[in-house]
Amino acid sequence: MPRRFVLFLCPLLAATPVAAEEPNLSAEGSATSGSATQLVLAQRVYRQATISGDPVLLLAAIRLARGIATRPAPGWERLGEGAPPPIPAPDRTGPPDQGSAAALKVLLGLASDDPNLQDLAYDLDAQVPQGKLPVATVAQAGLAGSAQDAWRVPLSGAVAAEIGLVGDGSGPLGLTVTDDSGAVFCAHPPAIDPALCRFTPARNGFFTVQVVNAGAEWNSYQLIGN
């Protein structure tokens, strides 16, 4: 290549801006709800059932929760340690387990005047899962009032992702998900109700999940993935 052409080309190359990394988001989403969506829905229905005292809603919440198996979230890294629990530590160890025996006991109490609903509750308790249940991953932590947490989460490209946040009900929690370029994929303002983010990464990568406790009290929460 002639030397004069090289000298002409160099300033052009130097003046060309480096393309910023594009957000790690696929245009193709998923129309199918996954395991994290089902658990978040179970928590929402459970909350409505406890507020209204409706045994039918509680039965639905238990069914939803028992239709999903859970395991610890592999590779989810909490960035730094959250504030230690206050002394004495709160009795709350996390959100209520909608599929627990305790929830079923509450259901039987609410349905004491309805034999048909009681039969449904007993049938639900006796049911054995048919086949392999869908699996949701769960990470649990606690957060002091007016504090925030951050998690680094690996996700696969072209695979629909779901990230849910469920608190213990002591105060409002906010949820934000960003990729390594800083692009915000999902932002839920603080609320008592569970939050859910659904998106599909374009490629393999890490994402930052931020949890904000806007309340004054300690909050034990769960992050749920599909």
Tell me what each language-model feature is.
Residues N24-S26, T32-R78, G205:
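N-terminal Sec/ER secretory leader and immediately downstream segment
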Residues P23-L25, Q118-K132, F207-N226:
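C-terminal edge strands of extracellular/lumenal beta-sandwich accessory domains
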Residues Q48, I62-R152:
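Non-catalytic extracellular/lumenal accessory regions of secreted precursors
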Residues M1-R4:
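Positively charged n-region of N-terminal signal peptides that target proteins for export
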Residues V6-T16:
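Bacterial N-terminal signal peptides
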Residues P55, G142-F206, Q210-N226:
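Acidic, Ser/Thr/Pro-rich low-complexity intrinsically disordered segments
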Residues V18-E22:
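Boundary at the C-terminal end of the N-terminal hydrophobic targeting segment
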